[in-house]
Design a protein with these regions (language model features):
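Alpha-helical transmembrane segments of multi-pass integral membrane proteins
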Residues: 18-25, 95-106, 122-133, 150-168
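Alpha-helical transmembrane segments of multi-pass membrane proteins
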Residues: 20-37
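Membrane-interface helix caps and helix-loop-helix hairpins in membrane proteins
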Residues: 105-119, 176-183, 204-207, 229-235
C-alpha cells in the first residue's frame, strides 16, 4: 500500500471513530433527553403493526454498538500497521461513514415524526451497509480475530438494519393509512415475514454468511413473544415465524457443516 493510500485509510479510520461516537451520543440523547420530548420506543407505538417484535428484541443494539466499537478501533489499528490484506478499502470506509450519517439522520427524522423521510434515511443506511458488507466479504477473511473484528460487526449490523427497514416500511404504510390493496393487516405481515426470511436465505446461500440469518431468527422470536402476549393472538403469524426460524436454523446448520468440510479439505 503506497503512502497516500495508507494516509487515506488512517484518516478515514479516525473520522469513522468520531462519527461512531456521534452515533452513540445521538442514540443516547434520543431516549435520554428525549429528542423532541418522546422516546424511540414511544414513537414506534404511534404506528402499531403486527411486524414489530417485542421490546426486548431491541436489546440487540447494545451488542451491535459494542461490535462496531471493536470494528472501528480495529480498523484504525490495521490502517496504522498497514495490514492491507485484511483492511477494508477506503471506499468501504467511506460507506461506513455514510452509515453513521444515515443512522444519526434517521434518529432525528424519526423523532420529529418525519416518517417518510426517515424511511429514505433507513434505505440510505441499508444501501451503505450492503456495499460495506460486499467489500468485507471480498476480503475472504480466514483468521478468527479478523472475522470477529471485521465480518461479525458488519454482518450483524447489516442483518438488523434489514429487519429495521421492513419495520420502517410498515410504519410508513400505517402512517399513510394505506389500504394494502384490501389485503388484511395480518396477511400483509405474513408477506413481509416471508420476504424477510427469503432475503436471509439468499444472503446465507449466496455469501455463506451464518450471522445474517441469525438476526432474522432473533427478530422472529421477538415477533412470537409479542404476538403471543396480545389479547388477539394471530396464530398464523406465530406459525409462520416458527416455520421461518426452523427453515433458517436448518439451512444455517447445513451451510455451517459444508463450510467446515471446505476448511478441513
Amino acid at each position: 500500500m503506497n503512502s497516500d493510500n495508507r494516509s487515506a485509510n488512517i484518516l478515514m479510520s479516525a473520522i469513522n471513530i468520531l462519527l461512531f461516537l456521534g452515533v452513540i451520543t445521538v442514540n443516547a440523547l434520543a431516549n435520554g433527553l428525549p429528542i423532541n420530548g418522546i422516546t424511540t420506543g414511544e414513537l414506534s407505538g404511534l404506528y402499531p403493526n403486527l411486524f414489530v417484535p417485542a421490546g426486548l428484541t431491541f436489546s440487540i443494539w447494545g451488542l451491535i454498538y459494542l461490535l462496531l466499537l471493536l470494528f472501528v478501533a480495529n480498523n484504525l489499528y490495521l490502517s496504522i500497521r498497514d495490514k492491507k490484506d485484511v483492511l477494508i478499502p477506503v471506499k468501504a470506509q467511506i460507506a461506513f461513514a455514510l452509515t453513521c450519517v444515515f443512522n444519526m439522520g434517521w434518529i432525528f427524522l424519526w423523532h420529529y415524526k418525519l416518517v417518510f423521510l426517515s424511511l429514505l434515511a433507513m434505505l440510505g443506511l441499508l444501501l451503505s451497509l450492503i456495499y460495506l458488507y460486499l467489500k468485507v466479504d471480498e476480503l475472504r477473511l480466514t483468521n478468527v480475530w479478523d472475522r470477529v473484528a471485521t465480518l461479525l460487526p458488519v454482518s450483524i449490523y447489516f442483518g438488523w438494519i434489514s429487519v429495521a427497514t421492513i419495520a420502517n416500511v410498515t410504519a410508513v404504510l400505517v402512517k399513510l393509512n394505506w389500504g394494502a390493496w384490501g389485503i388484511p393487516e395480518h396477511v400483509w405481515t405474513l408477506i413481509m415475514m416471508i420476504v424477510g426470511a427469503a432475503l436471509a436465505i439468499l444472503v446465507l446461500l449466496r455469501h455463506k454468511c451464518l450471522l445474517y440469518p441469525l438476526v432474522f431468527i432473533w427478530a422472529y422470536i421477538g415477533i412470537i413473544i409479542k404476538r403471543s402476549a396480545q389479547e388477539v393472538v394471530h396464530k398464523d403469524i406465530i406459525f409462520t415465524a416458527y416455520a421461518a426460524i426452523a427453515v433458517l436454523a436448518v439451512l444455517i446448520v447445513i451451510t455451517g457443516m459444508r463450510l467446515r468440510k471446505e476448511l478441513q479439505a
